[in-house]
């Protein structure tokens, strides 16, 4: 007999059984996998990098316009050191870092006027553009299948935006005034 007149068969057990604990762990594990798949950390990082590209392309575009304003409408020469020209002129204090393209199939533009992955095109009388390839699915899906998504700053339009081109080797052109997204 136990104290208080209880016998061993009526004693209440406190705590969880091993089976109950395993079921809870399995449910939590399943929820964790579902949440991880929904968040897709690779695409989260790609969207973050794309946001940085939007910002940098816009800043470079404004610097090009300021350079042209201070140089009687003449834009920087199209070369592999076009950003250094903006730094030397005092339009920006430091060249933006190189673009990190981490998603398979995404690469810098093939133009010859590329510095640190930032692309530049200039046509006399038409204006200049700064552009970079976008990599997140959220931006790529704004274009039709097989097309490439770019962030572009156009001096002809006086602003930046997203542009779709026929494919990854078709680049935006200077004088662009219409944006896809």
Outline where the language-model segments fall.
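Short, Lys/Arg-enriched N-terminal segments with co-localized hydrophobic residues
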Residues: 1-7
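Aliphatic-rich helix starts adjacent to a transmembrane/signal segment
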Residues: 38-58
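Active-site-adjacent beta-strand anchor residues
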Residues: 21, 50, 114
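N-terminal single-pass transmembrane signal-anchor helix
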Residues: 9-39
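Extracellular/periplasmic head regions of type IV pilus-like filament subunits
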Residues: 65, 69-138, 180-181
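Short, surface-exposed interaction loops/tails
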Residues: 126-181
């Amino acid at each position: 007999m136990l104290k208080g007149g209880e016998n061993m068969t009526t004693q209440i057990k406190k705590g969880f059984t091993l089976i109950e604990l395993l079921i809870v762990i399995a449910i939590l594990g399943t929820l964790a996998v579902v949440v991880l798949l929904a968040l897709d950390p690779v695409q989260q990082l790609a969207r973050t990098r794309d946001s940085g590209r939007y910002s940098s392309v816009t800043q470079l575009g404004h610097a090009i316009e300021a350079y042209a304003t201070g140089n009687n409408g003449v834009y920087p020469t199209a070369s592999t050191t076009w950003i250094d020209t903006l730094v030397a002129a005092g339009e920006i204090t430091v060249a933006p870092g190189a673009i990190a393209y981490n998603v398979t199939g995404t690469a810098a533009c093939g133009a010859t006027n590329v510095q640190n992955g930032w692309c530049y095109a200039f046509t006399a009388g038409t204006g200049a553009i700064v552009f970079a390839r976008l990599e997140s699915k959220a931006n790529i899906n704004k274009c039709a299948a097989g097309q490439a998504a770019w962030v572009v700053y156009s001096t002809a339009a006086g602003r930046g935006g997203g542009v779709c081109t026929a494919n990854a080797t078709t680049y935006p052109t200077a004088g662009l005034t219409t944006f896809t997204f």
